[in-house]
Amino acid sequence: SSAASDVYKRQVFARSHAAPTTSPWTRELRERWELMKNDLGDIEIFGENLYAIHSIEYRKLETHFYVFAVRCLDQWLSWEEVKFYAALFDLPTVPELRVETVEGLTREALQQQVVSLAQEPGVFGTRDPQTGADCTREGVVTRNIGEYPVSEFARNVFKYVRKGHVKTDEHWTRNWKRARLIWEIRKEE
């Protein structure tokens, strides 16, 4: 599992914009922000921060932060623009599972596709940290490929999270561990 983070000119935030994050698992991201902040302008970059392991351990991470959205003022940018800005700041985007038109797609067919995708192994080598066994991906995010106003977010994005992906009985932040990158894992094998 992961923690969403927002990087923009004022600070780095984790999920909420109530206060900037100072957690130890966002240190690397905050250091990166220091290098980028003067170039962001009105751009806000949103992504998954996979630095800390919690409900899923990823075994094929090349880096710890993956961009999933970019906002400029009151607009969420198109997926093409997200990829452009991510590349501009040398940040990877989250993996694309499918890009297709939804014209004529029924709610039932979309639900079946999303549930099917969620039952597959994750692109980043998903593993249950408690058992060490491989597991399916945490879920699937579906978004409109075009740009849309911030006020229309709920009509353009949805996230499906599989039942039971969180198995810890205590909050992961108490005894967190850093997620190793793929080259670190290969070096140990």
Where on the chain are the PLM-derived regions?
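Conserved loop->alpha-helix
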Residues: 9-52
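Short, glycine-/Ser/Thr-/acidic-enriched flexible segments
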Residues: 17-19, 50-52, 72-73, 146-147, ...
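Charged, compositionally biased interaction regions
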Residues: 91-189
